[in-house]
Amino acid sequence: MRYLPLTPEDRVEMLGAIGVKSIDDLFVDVPVSARRDAPVDLPHHAGELDVEREMAGLARRNRAAGEGPFFCGAGAYRHHVPATVDHIIQRSEFLTSYTPYQPEIAQGTLQVLFEFQTQVAALTGMEVANASLYDGSTGAAEAVMMAQRVTRRNKAVMSGGVHPHYVGAIETLAHAAGVATQALPAAVDAEDAVIAAIDQDTACVVVQTPNVFGTVTDVSKIAEAAHAAGALLIVVTTEAVSFGLLKSPGEMGADIAVAEGQSIGNGLNFGGPYVGLFACKEKFVRQMPGRLCGETVDADGKRGFVLTLSTREQHIRRDKATSNICTNSGLCALAFSIHMSLLGETGLRQLAAVNHQKALALRDALKAVPGVEILTPRFFNEFAIRVPGKAAEVVEILAAHGVIAGVPFSRLDAKAGLDDVLLVAATETTLDIDIPVFAKALTKVFAQ
């Protein structure tokens, strides 16, 4: 097909067909203050080499995670990704994030998704898992919508330990769906407050373990309280490696388990793309959002894989759809599945143990720093500390000395009144020498 550009006469004819005089008439509902009528002042075009140099200069303004001591977490964790993962996902058969709509030519991709679902169900201790969602936060929001459909109630209670960004995503989607949300105040240990907030109008209770402060909680009591009130329990996990050591959501009575899978097979990716893990009890499968890959038998009796229970709005009436998720980061799900296959159950357990040991060493070192208070009593590979003054200022000072000290809680929730709280994490990538360097740097800052 040839490309035929629009002529001025074509534009006049098209505008007349829709009943307007000019292109500007199409944007009268946009406030004048929000319009940009003047040309954008962009630099002149440049050759490829010059552009590469310019981009490299911009990149040098950032400090890469591996350039020095690095203790950031708060929902995005630096882990080692084996070279095998990148090698396999770059095969031409896999290098696409697109939905495998035609099963007859996508059996390999569909089988990978089926294996991914099996791995996620095993990790979360649930009966069924979908083929991934965009990320952990949107997965949590989808879980709340699912709970509304299952219970026919319109209230979601969110623990004070749920990551503030997840709370924001839930509130955004819930508002449009007519679901009332009750976000409890941020708290290191929020179990009692959550139980007290459950009532007969509650559709679901959203808890996180390890929570945003790193606290590990057995949420079995919360599950009992939620179920007694007829509500569902949604358990969120932002650090998937923790599944190697801790009780699974299913073991603790979760109805829906949501997790961010970035920690396995995926880098920090400057905040995205990530991969959302979503699993639930089988009795709720018809209300589960996203795609589900199933195993079947063809007309010749051969095993095959297909997308099943596709209740997305692209397939059925919008008001009956369980989600509107479209092409998501399927390649990230593949990376997750490959890394999990390389680790195996024993490897994941060993990796999780190393993470916990590194965090214990970090805790012991920081506990000895005058002025530092350890706030998190039980943790996996991340915990919160209280520092003298504002944590954000401490982070900036240490960054100037080459130490990325962690994430100030105020950057996640500026209104929580926790300006002196710093979240620090350690993984298998944390060098033993990095820990005393961090502790000594903190000591010097507080001594000034």
Swiss-Prot record:
Q: What class of enzyme is it?
A: oxidoreductase
Which Enzyme Commission number(s) are on file for it? 1.4.4.2
Keyword list (alphabetical) reads:
Oxidoreductase
An annotated Gene Ontology molecular function = glycine dehydrogenase (decarboxylating) activity
Q: Which reaction does it catalyse?
A: N(6)-[(R)-lipoyl]-L-lysyl-[glycine-cleavage complex H protein] + glycine + H(+) = N(6)-[(R)-S(8)-aminomethyldihydrolipoyl]-L-lysyl-[glycine-cleavage complex H protein] + CO2
User: Which biological process, per GO, is one annotated for this protein?
Assistant: glycine decarboxylation via glycine cleavage system
Q: Which Pfam families match?
A: GDC-P
Name the domain of life this protein comes from: Bacteria
Instruction: Tell me the function of this protein.
Output: The glycine cleavage system catalyzes the degradation of glycine. The P protein binds the alpha-amino group of glycine through its pyridoxal phosphate cofactor; CO(2) is released and the remaining methylamine moiety is then transferred to the lipoamide cofactor of the H protein.
User: How is this protein organized at the quaternary level?
Assistant: The glycine cleavage system is composed of four proteins: P, T, L and H. In this organism, the P 'protein' is a heterodimer of two subunits.
Family to which this protein belongs: Belongs to the GcvP family. N-terminal subunit subfamily.
Query: What is the name listed in the Swiss-Prot or TrEMBL entry for this protein?
Result: Probable glycine dehydrogenase (decarboxylating) subunit 1
Species this chain originates from = Caulobacter vibrioides (strain NA1000 / CB15N) (Caulobacter crescentus)
- Lineage of the native species? Bacteria, Pseudomonadati, Pseudomonadota, Alphaproteobacteria, Caulobacterales
Name the gene for this chain: gcvPA
